[in-house]
Amino acid sequence: MPLVNIKIAKDNVTPEKKAELIKGATQLLVDVLGKNPQTTVVIIEEVDTDNWGIGGISVTERRKLGL
């Protein structure tokens, strides 16, 4: 049973977009690895931008700086 864990910034991603991510990730494993879509698990974790850092700066701060 393959498991895909997708981490995204908590950014008002709509349920429809999350459904697209789940469908797309599942299909990718079917197409590339021949996995059964019925046993493929996709988890989407939304991370608060204060808890996500890039280059030593939180995503919240990077956005304020226009980076």
Model-derived features with residue positions:
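A domain-level signal for the structural core that forms small-molecule/cofactor-binding pockets
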Residues: 2-67
